[in-house]
């Protein structure tokens, strides 16, 4: 057993990398630790490419084991079930970072597994997972170009915080994860509280500087392990075939990419591709396969579009580099929903619906760092059905992409939501992508803002989002505003920014190349701000503040009762509160502090529930007159029900000014009489009838 270990300090944390003790049959295996948080990272790759493989089959799976925090799973089977949203998002985070570092043409299957085996309640495992993946890939021998580093950045009181703890993040205006190589940033994922572009860019630069120590130590660790790289040779380019496609079909391809409508353009490109295959397949003595012709046809497509952009020709749909596509904005189009909006930007369209529910509808989330489940009162779900791109497909489980896009849109909105105390609803927003041609997640941000305001949610400010792109060849580059799907596919960067007129709420960046500069990011942020303000201006012309007159908005309130009245409200075995719910058809929840939350979609139902709760929990007032029912006669007086579950004693001496020998001579059970509360003694109610009678 040849164990190798490397330790270094990163900010306030101690990072340790170890290999040679666990999972020795994997091609690369590292036990990575950040303080007491430990993850086991394994890398396995097939030595050969599958026949006909035309894509890079990289899979990254981040798995949180409940035993890592001394817990047993709560499911019936007592095993970890399907991936949580956190696991899916972390898997995507790492995948997006490492994918650009594999060489073009490498098609061997690679599986990366990250297992959290010990979790500290203060340290998020995602950063150490990223560093562990970097180390495991570096020692595995696969053609992974260079180590990566990653760090989380917070921002509080005008200062950046490196790898903040969970507690520090609660007081931070920024939660940003940045990853990249020693030369460039490859990935950014962030959520912010309306911060300026300058602060956001400064955080990216700060993170890049801080994770250099990790890259240096991972490189040294790789050298110490001494793993040999695979003898992988990149496929040789068929220059003759590439030249033939350019010469024979280049002009047609260039012309096709001037067709503005996506489906028409794709149909024309498909026709040209089929013509190229028919003309060039088996043309030379070695024979060109249809797959090979199609492969190089895509290369010509890519170079054609990129050259047009770099030469400052008009873009595919005729726009210049800084123009946002035409917008069409509608609200309230679904008549029986609480709030709705249809946001259309060019050929991208999102139908966004807001639903308001009681606090009891909150999503319960289990987290490694928390011993108790936490309530999530804001949900944003993103759906991408196949029809939105003119295709058929299976409607199976939620895809990773849908989870990721929904999370990004949620991050763009969260900073502007009211607190649960200010707005005691569970809010669910669903974005149905009904058409897609680029930047559907940012359309979801815009549609969500509109839909929330239509539902009457008092958001702090309208929010809009925009996706930026990049085409770069050597020193030439062009930043594109509001990219199309083809520009995203054929370009070098996907840079998404969401925020208000005051600042940035969310920033996500994915890079396909390794030479993104500070200047490029600065230009992208500047253009994104201009576009965001433009979109907000058009959105504000349709709706700029919450719709307080929406008749579909549910009614809710919180009534504060004394804690000793909780049992009166609940009743024996829940009989009282169940009766109120059944009678009023409202939703009612009460907590241990005496907060009673009443919710209903109907005004009459709501009013009935409120009155019934007040009646049951009301406290009699001294000197107030009540009309009560005689419920029991005793020798020393009578018990009078003056409120629901509230009986008071009318003493025989308080029935009349005259001497009363027998109570039944004056009142009988079932009689309704007026009485006055003359005293409260340790919960006992003292009543008088005679004070209301003339002497």
Swiss-Prot record:
One of its GO terms (cellular component) is cytosol. GO terms for molecular function: 3'-5'-RNA exonuclease activity; magnesium ion binding; polyribonucleotide nucleotidyltransferase activity; RNA binding. Residues 554-613 form the KH domain. Gene3D superfamilies: GHMP Kinase, N-terminal domain, K Homology domain, type 1, Nucleic acid-binding proteins. One of its GO terms (biological process) is RNA processing. The keyword Iron does not apply. Involved in mRNA degradation. Catalyzes the phosphorolysis of single-stranded polyribonucleotides processively in the 3'- to 5'-direction. Component of the RNA degradosome, which is a multiprotein complex involved in RNA processing and mRNA degradation. CDD domains: KH-I_PNPase, RNase_PH_PNPase_1, RNase_PH_PNPase_2, S1_PNPase. Its EC number is 2.7.7.8. Its cofactor is Mg(2+). It is an enzyme of class 2 (transferase). HAMAP family: PNPase. It holds the Pfam family RNase_PH. It catalyses: RNA(n+1) + phosphate = RNA(n) + a ribonucleoside 5'-diphosphate. It is found in: Cytoplasm. Belongs to the polyribonucleotide nucleotidyltransferase family. The lineage of its organism: Bacteria, Pseudomonadati, Pseudomonadota, Gammaproteobacteria, Candidatus Pseudothioglobaceae. The keyword Lipid biosynthesis does not apply. Residues 623-690 form the S1 motif domain. Mg(2+) binds at residues 488, 494. InterPro entries: ExoRNase_PH_dom1, ExoRNase_PH_dom2, ExoRNase_PH_dom2_sf, KH_dom, KH_dom_type_1, KH_dom_type_1_sf, NA-bd_OB-fold, PNPase. SMART domains: KH, S1. This is Polyribonucleotide nucleotidyltransferase. The gene is pnp. Keywords: Cytoplasm, Magnesium, Metal-binding, Nucleotidyltransferase, RNA-binding, Transferase.
């Amino acid at each position: 057993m040849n164990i190798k270990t490397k330790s270094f300090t990163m900010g306030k944390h101690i990072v340790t990398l170890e290999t040679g003790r666990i999972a020795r049959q994997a091609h690369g295996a590292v036990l990575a630790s950040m303080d007491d948080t430990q993850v086991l990272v394994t890398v396995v790759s097939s030595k050969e490419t599958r026949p006909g493989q035309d894509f890079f089959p990289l899979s990254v799976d981040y798995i949180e084991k409940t035993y890592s925090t001394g817990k047993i799973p709560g499911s019936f089977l007592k095993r970890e079930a399907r991936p949580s949203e956190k696991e899916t998002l972390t898997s995507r985070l790492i995948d997006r970072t490492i994918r650009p570092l594999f060489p073009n043409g490498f098609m061997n299957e690679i599986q990366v597994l990250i297992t959290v085996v010990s979790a500290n309640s203060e340290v998020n495992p995602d950063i150490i997972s990223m560093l562990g993946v970097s180390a495991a890939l570096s020692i595995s021998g696969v053609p992974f170009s260079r180590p990566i580093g990653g760090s989380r950045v917070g921002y509080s009181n005008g200062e950046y915080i490196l790898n903040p703890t969970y507690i520090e993040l609660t007081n931070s205006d920024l939660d940003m994860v940045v990853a990249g190589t020693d030369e460039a940033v490859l990935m950014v994922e962030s959520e912010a509280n309306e911060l300026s572009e300058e602060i956001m860019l400064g955080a990216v630069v700060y993170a890049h500087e801080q994770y250099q120590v990790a890259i240096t130590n991972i490189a040294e660790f790789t050298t110490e392990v001494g793993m040999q790289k695979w003898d992988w040779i990149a496929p040789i380019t068929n220059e003759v075939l590439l030249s033939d496609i350019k010469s024979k079909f280049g002009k047609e391809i260039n012309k096709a990419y001037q067709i503005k409508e996506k489906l028409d353009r794709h149909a024309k490109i498909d026709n040209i591709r089929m013509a190229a295959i028919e003309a060039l397949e088996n043309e030379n003595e070695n024979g060109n396969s249809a797959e090979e012709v199609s492969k190089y046809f895509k290369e010509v497509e890519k170079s054609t579009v990129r050259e047009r952009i770099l030469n400052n020709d008009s873009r595919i749909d005729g726009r210049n580099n800084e123009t946002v596509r035409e917008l069409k904005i509608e609200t309230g189009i679904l008549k029986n929903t609480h709030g709705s909006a249809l946001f259309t930007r060019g050929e991208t369209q999102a139908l966004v619906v807001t639903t308001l529910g009681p606090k009891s509808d909150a999503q319960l989330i289990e987290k490694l760092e928390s011993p108790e489940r936490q309530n999530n009162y804001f949900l944003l779900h993103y759906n991408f059905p196949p029809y939105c791109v003119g295709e058929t497909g299976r409607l199976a489980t939620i895809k990773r992409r849908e989870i990721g896009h929904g999370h990004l849109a949620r991050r763009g909105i969260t900073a502007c939501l009211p607190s649960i105390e200010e707005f005691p609803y569970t809010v669910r927003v669903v974005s149905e992508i009904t058409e897609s041609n680029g930047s559907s997640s940012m359309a979801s941000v815009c549609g969500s803002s509109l839909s929330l305001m239509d539902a009457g949610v008092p958001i702090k400010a309208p929010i809009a989002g925009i996706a930026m792109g990049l085409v770069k060849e050597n020193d030439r580059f062009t930043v594109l505003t509001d990219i199309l799907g083809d520009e995203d596919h054929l370009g070098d960067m996907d840079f998404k920014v969401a925020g208000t007129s005051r600042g940035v709420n969310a920033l996500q960046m994915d890079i396909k190349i390794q030479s993104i500069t500070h200047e490029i990011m600065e230009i992208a942020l500047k253009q994104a701000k201009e576009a965001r303000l433009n979109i907000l201006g058009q959105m504000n012309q349709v709706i700029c503040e919450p719709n307080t007159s929406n008749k579909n908005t549910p009614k809710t309130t919180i009534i504060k009762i004394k804690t000793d009245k909780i049992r009166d409200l609940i009743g024996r075995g829940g009989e009282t509160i169940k009766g109120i719910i059944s009678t009023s058809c409202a939703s009612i929840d009460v907590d241990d502090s005496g907060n009673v939350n009443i919710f209903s979609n109907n005004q009459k139902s709501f009013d009935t529930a409120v009155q019934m709760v007040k009646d049951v929990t009301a406290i009699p007032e001294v000197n107030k007159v009540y009309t009560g029912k005689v419920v029991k006669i005793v020798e020393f007086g009578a018990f009078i029900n003056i409120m629901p579950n509230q009986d008071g004693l009318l003493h025989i001496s308080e029935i009349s000014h005259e001497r009363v020998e027998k109570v039944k001579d004056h009142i009988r059970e079932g009689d309704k009489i007026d009485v006055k509360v003359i005293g409260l003694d340790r919960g006992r109610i003292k009543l008088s009838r005679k004070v209301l009678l003339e002497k």
